Amino acid sequence: AQINGTRLRPDQTIQTGDSIATGAGATLIFVVGNSSFKVRQNSRMSVERGGTLRTVSILRLLGGAVVSVWGQGPRRQIVTPTLTAGIRGTGVYTEVFAAQNDRSYFCNCYGTVDVSSGSDQVTSRADYHQAFWGEPQPRNGRTLTSANMINHSDEELEMLARLVAQRTAWQVMGKRGVKDGKGYLEDKPGQMHPTQMLGK
């Protein structure tokens, strides 16, 4: 892993303002303030400084993937080439697919997030994995579309939550839901994904 273009040393800490790059087979786990991050292999991102050295204001993911848990605090953002998410206090997974014109995948694993892509914008409220695609080109007239849960696990979120003395929504409620990307712990009639409400 590299920090600001230099190989990360075992005794080095990651701070806001740093740029991070991981190579093949590398995984990087770190904490900044009340937020924790697991950066996957072949990823490029930066953590931009908020009001203090220990507050992340923007996580900018240029490529690859990151799982993150965010404590309560001032409004923060995750920015990818095709999607922006306004974070309140939540656990999320974000991935940029370079081979698909930087198509971005975003899962609000639990919590409340404002998600936008192009002119499409929704508020996601999830107890259990509500997922989206930020499309590089409109699909059926939309740049924000629904997705299934992919490429991350409950256990990753639980581990990151423990690092910042938190518990996931499903740990608090004592049950797990259906991993269909809709965001609900129980499948009930009439439940809709937020993208189904766009244009209504």
Whereabouts are the PLM-identified features?
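Flexible, surface-exposed loop/linker segments and immediately adjacent secondary-structure boundaries
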Residues: A1-T27, V31-K200
